[in-house]
From Swiss-Prot:
Function (record text): Converts 2-succinyl-6-hydroxy-2,4-cyclohexadiene-1-carboxylate (SHCHC) to 2-succinylbenzoate (OSB).
Family: Belongs to the mandelate racemase/muconate lactonizing enzyme family. MenC type 1 subfamily.
Protein name (Swiss-Prot/TrEMBL): o-succinylbenzoate synthase
Record organism: Escherichia coli (strain SMS-3-5 / SECEC)
Domain of life: Bacteria
Gene assigned in the entry: menC
């Protein structure tokens, strides 16, 4: 016997969260809970404004239609990426095919005063990998901050993300302020320039390795080994079903590329599932999941060690 519930939710965000030049005041999304016999499976559907092609309202419409079809015996996955991902997670939990083991290590997202960051990063246990958003300020400032962190902490490796913010000139301005002796400790820089060709040129000219992120979701993208390209950053909420995520990871690994499972600012429920996916598909790579502190609460499932208050399922708005 099948049954299902769909919940709608909103979580207040910290004041400083800006995506694609717009301030994100609340994170909105949906949960689906599927039950069959004694088993149940959960999934999160939370399109990311400015990055997902679908809106929250469009995802809700597609999800409700899919759930009704599933209750009637139809299991075909929807095409909309955020819905396909959430539904496939729920089905995987239901079938016990999503392993429970999780990778809760995080590459901390570095914000704020560089002196405070140096103290925090120097105290990190184990492998020191951190992430810095660049492209939000002047490229020269970004270069100086990155150089300062790498100089102060000799065993630190940085993942940088420019979100295609730079022209070739700005990319060169950034690189000018990063000591060539430190550049090998930039694990990768995600999508430095507005076009892939400019990003490739940046890698050739600076010796700084790059990673593809937005490019993975463009229709003309193909997985190929290229000089200067070290990694792909896979955001499952923007990608689609678990099968599609696994196919992309396998394609990257076959070329010797690092595949990083990364957050689209999901709630704690979605983040714990991403941690399980990372442990399953990319066990040797620290995932990019350090986004929970951008929110003011957890929901349904806790992220280990987080002090944020937990909102229980009974407090959510039920749609079905």
């Amino acid at each position: 016997m099948r049954s299902a519930q769909v919940y709608r939710w909103q979580i207040p965000m910290d004041a400083g969260v800006v995506l694609r030049d717009r301030r994100l005041k609340t994170r909105e999304g949906l949960y689906v809970c599927l039950r069959e016999g004694e088993r149940e499976g959960w999934g999160e559907i939370s399109p990311l404004p400015g990055f997902s092609q679908e809106t929250w309202e469009e995802a809700q419409s597609v999800l409700l239609a899919w759930v009704n079809n599933w209750l009637a015996g139809d299991c075909e996955l929807p095409q909309m990426p955020s819905v396909a991902f959430g539904v496939s997670c729920a089905l995987a939990e239901l079938a016990d095919t999503l392993p429970q083991a999780a990778n809760y290590r995080a590459a901390p997202l570095c914000n704020g005063d560089p002196d405070d960051l140096i103290l925090k990063l120097a105290d990190m246990p184990g492998e020191k990998v951190a992430k810095v958003k660049v492209g939000l300020y002047e490229a020269v400032r970004d270069g100086m901050v990155v150089n300062l962190l790498l100089e102060a902490i000799p065993d630190l490796h940085l993942r940088l993300d420019a979100n295609r913010a730079w022209t070739p000139l700005k990319g060169q301005q950034f690189a000018k302020y990063v000591n060539p002796d430190y550049r090998h400790r930039i694990a990768f820089l995600e999508e430095p320039c507005k076009t892939r060709d400019d990003s490739r040129a940046f890698a050739r000219e600076t010796g700084i390795a790059i990673a593809w992120d937005e490019s993975l979701r463009e229709p003309d993208f193909a997985f190929v080994a290229e000089k200067g390209v070290r990694a792909v950053v896979i955001k499952p909420t923007l990608t689609g079903s678990l099968d599609k995520v696994r196919e992309q990871v396998q394609a990257a690994h076959a070329l010797g590329l690092t595949a990083v499972i990364s957050s689209s600012i999901e709630s704690s429920l979605g983040l714990t599932q991403l941690a399980r996916i990372a442990a399953w598909l990319t066990p040797d790579t620290i995932p990019g999941l350090d986004t929970l502190d951008l929110m003011q609460a957890q929901q349904v499932r806790r992220w280990p060690g987080s002090p944020l208050p937990l909102v229980e399922v009974d407090a959510l708005e039920r749609l079905l």
